A protein has these predicted regions:
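Glycine-rich phosphate-binding loop and adjoining beta1-alpha1-beta2 segment
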Residues: 1-32
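Residues at the starts of beta-strands that form the adenosine-phosphate
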Residues: 2, 36, 113
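Structural motif
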Residues: 6, 40, 117-118
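Flexible loop/turn segments at secondary-structure boundaries
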Residues: 11-14, 47, 62, 122-125, ...
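Short acidic low-complexity segments
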Residues: 36-49
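N-terminal Rossmann-like NAD(P) cofactor-binding module of classical short-chain dehydrogenase/reductase
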Residues: 47-57
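Rossmann-fold NAD(P)-binding glycine/threonine-rich loop
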Residues: 59-128
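Long, compositionally biased stretches enriched for glycine and/or charged residues
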Residues: 126-370
Length: 370
């Protein structure tokens, strides 16, 4: 079956770079005359007849990200792109664009599967009992041939501190929890250690400028490795483990997801899906991050252990804040934007929330008092 891949860069200046990377990256892996790769700046035209749509957008670009981090830090709270004030600010300007894209897909490709990039994971040779939200989950069991080997891992300090989460949290704290939390929980467990850290937002902005000056597969790979090496660098003293850098990235998992749907090949992946009855602390419509069974019918959550008791309050609070962010983004009202920021546990202040909205160059002009 012939396949057409249409890339839709957000800026015309990105087209040449995208073409160059795809052309070289192919390297003969695609069957000759079976895959056609094109680029377009017309989203509606690109969507027509699509079976799958991959969405990976950063509204406001890296300039927006740098502002997310620097404004939050300047107001005395954590300056990080994903969690806290930075994550809320990113959501406030992204939701309207995502809704517009969804509407256009419903018109031009109503039968398409839409895969939105978050941070999915693949299960290989083991069953991972993992539950939570995006960037806020707990690994509570690792089952190999029917046996949970997580207790053995927690008892072995050397092995436990040989990977990223073990180095980040330390063996003693992980044993106290009886689970391995997602690395982003570090921002909640040790707020005082990270709130004083420098913002990383300016680094990828400069890095991107270098890449688009002379795009190539080599510079693309170098850019990717630099990004992985420096991510959450403020939380650790050592270099990131090479195993974490060579995993292929979540783009590989997204392709596995597409393949499972297209070929009806049953696959289990950790994905963000509607909760239904999976986690008892959340309602059926809440989006959760859990192991999911994927086939031609899509992805369905699999029954897993519940969120640890100590995590229930945080999970429910962040889900409330997530919905407040969506409401603010759609309404465009300053009061709702302030509320969304103030409700986040890493902000937890109405006065600071107001300062962030007024000081943020990507928010102040949009969220004005009504």
């Amino acid at each position: 079956m012939d396949t057409t891949l249409v890339e839709v860069p957000l800026k015309r200046s990105m087209i040449k770079a995208a073409d160059q990377v795809v052309l070289v990256a192919d390297g003969g892996k695609f069957p000759p005359n079976k895959v056609t790769v094109t680029t377009s700046t017309d989203l509606d035209e690109a969507l027509r007849g699509a079976d799958f749509v991959f969405s990976a957008i950063r509204v406001g670009g890296l300039e927006g990200r740098a502002a997310d981090e620097s404004v939050a830090a300047g107001c005395g709270v954590l300056g990080q792109e994903t969690v806290g004030a930075g994550g809320v600010a990113y959501g406030l300007r992204t939701v309207p664009v995502a809704v517009d894209i969804a509407r256009r897909i419903s018109v031009h490709a109503p039968d398409a599967w839409v895969i939105n990039f978050t941070n999915p994971a693949e299960l290989e040779d083991a069953w991972l009992d993992y539950a939570g939200l995006n960037h806020l989950g707990w690994l509570r069991g690792v089952h190999v041939h029917g046996r949970d080997v997580l207790p053995d891992l927690l008892a072995d300090s050397v092995r436990l501190e040989s990977f990223e989460e073990g180095k980040l949290f330390g063996a003693e704290w992980l044993r106290t929890l009886g689970a391995i939390p997602n690395e982003y929980l570090h921002y909640y467990f040790t707020r005082e250690a990270v709130e004083s850290g420098a913002s990383r937002g300016a680094f990828p902005l400069e890095q991107q400028k270098r890449f688009y000056t002379a795009p190539s597969l080599e510079s693309w790979e170098q850019t990717r490795l630099e990004r992985e090496q420096t991510y959450m660098a403020e939380t650790r003293d050592d270099e990131r483990d090479t195993d974490d850098l060579d995993g292929g990235g979540y783009e590989r998992v997204a392709l596995d997801l597409m393949h499972a749907i297209a070929s009806d090949k049953r696959t289990t992946l950790i994905l963000n899906v509607p909760n239904k009855t999976t986690l008892s602390c959340l309602d059926a419509d809440a989006v959760v991050e859990v192991p999911s069974l994927v086939d031609s019918n899509g992805a369905r959550p699999i029954a897993v252990g519940q969120v640890p008791d100590e995590g229930v309050g945080l999970v429910t609070a962040l889900k409330v804040d997530e919905r407040a962010t969506i409401r603010a983004a759609i309404s465009g009202e300053r009061a709702h934007a302030v509320k969304a920021l103030a409700l986040h546990p890493l902000v937890d202040s109405v006065s600071i929330a107001r300062k962030i909205v007024d000081a943020h160059p990507f928010l102040s002009g949009v969220f004005r008092a009504r």
